[in-house]
């Protein structure tokens, strides 16, 4: 049974401005593992990655029912399986977590579905 659904849309340029304003922005938003992956990218691809990971964190917090203020950014980690499918590693929700992530040239969208039973 679906117990939560969250969607977030992020403008990639907003993350470029945040990085320019604070060079440690990515370190604050990403987990250590996510930051390690982020550091392998440059330019626009790095910004897409950062915006995507943030959007997943936001979407998860909405699905969880608390919003981002109650879920620490470091508590939700998005990784990819060997086929490239994103998945969320977290200890907050006891159930199945589904995640979908997509990009355009200017936007990132993330959807998270929380399921039990």
Curated annotation (Swiss-Prot):
One of its GO terms (cellular component) is cytoplasm. Its main location: cytoplasm. It is found in: Cytoplasm. InterPro entries: 4-PPantetheinyl_Trfase_dom, 4-PPantetheinyl_Trfase_dom_sf, ACPS, Ppantetheine-prot_Trfase_dom. Mg(2+) binds at residues 8, 58. The keyword Nucleotide-binding does not apply. It is an enzyme of class 2 (transferase). Keywords: Cytoplasm, Fatty acid biosynthesis, Fatty acid metabolism, Lipid biosynthesis, Lipid metabolism, Magnesium, Metal-binding, Transferase. It catalyses: apo-[ACP] + CoA = holo-[ACP] + adenosine 3',5'-bisphosphate + H(+). Its EC number is 2.7.8.7. Pfam families: ACPS. One of its GO terms (molecular function) is magnesium ion binding. Gene3D superfamilies: 4'-phosphopantetheinyl transferase domain. Its cofactor is Mg(2+). Transmembrane segments: none annotated. GO terms for biological process: fatty acid biosynthetic process. NCBIfam families: acpS, pantethn_trn. Belongs to the P-Pant transferase superfamily. AcpS family. Transfers the 4'-phosphopantetheine moiety from coenzyme A to a Ser of acyl-carrier-protein. HAMAP family: AcpS. This is Holo-[acyl-carrier-protein] synthase. The gene is acpS.
